[in-house]
């Protein structure tokens, strides 16, 4: 069972700038884990320390700002905040649920159109080198730079 609110807006005040904002608020209840009478989990137990579905944050925020230098060149800064979320434990902690910490990731993307046929994309992902986990004991990648050349037909 889950319900929530999602807001998304985009604003382009002029030909040089574009902005985006997104917010998600989620409430959910994982009855398969927290209501299972055969499990050690249950409301208030250490094995079910939060009743949210696993890996679903209550709050998530996305901010995007783009500077458009010309018809061929733009640069975008992306910021993503993900709130705390519940995850399953494993043998290392007696299979008790855990709470994954909130985190902020910042990406920088540059797009350049070449000859109206190619699009060069250079992405600097996680530029602040945030250390976080999307799943218990599985660390997310650190800072990375990606290059992509795409041909448009």
Regions found by a protein language model. Name each.
Residues 1-90, 117-119, 128, 148:
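Gram-negative outer-membrane beta-barrel transporters
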Residues 2, 58, 103-104, 142:
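Membrane-spanning beta-strands of outer-membrane beta-barrel proteins
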Residues 12-14, 68, 101, 113, ...:
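Surface-exposed coil/turn segments at beta-strand junctions on protein surfaces, enriched
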Residues 48-54, 95-99, 134-136:
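Outer-membrane beta-barrel domain signature
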Residues 81-92, 105-153:
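C-terminal beta-signal and adjacent terminal beta-strands/loops
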């Amino acid at each position: 069972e889950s319900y929530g609110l999602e807001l998304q807006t985009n604003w382009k005040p002029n030909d040089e700038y574009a902005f985006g904002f997104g917010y998600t608020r989620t409430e959910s209840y994982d009855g398969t884990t927290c209501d299972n009478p055969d499990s050690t989990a249950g409301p208030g137990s250490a094995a079910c320390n939060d009743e949210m579905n696993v890996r679903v944050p209550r709050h998530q925020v996305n901010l995007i700002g783009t500077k458009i230098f010309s018809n061929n060149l733009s640069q975008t800064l992306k910021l993503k905040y993900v709130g705390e979320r519940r995850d399953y434990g494993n043998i290392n902690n007696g299979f008790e649920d855990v709470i994954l910490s909130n985190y902020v990731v910042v990406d920088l993307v540059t797009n350049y159109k070449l000859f109206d046929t190619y699009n060069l994309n250079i992405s600097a992902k996680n530029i602040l080198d945030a250390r976080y986990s999307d799943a218990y004991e599985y660390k997310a990648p650190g800072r990375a730079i990606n290059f992509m050349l795409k041909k448009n037909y």
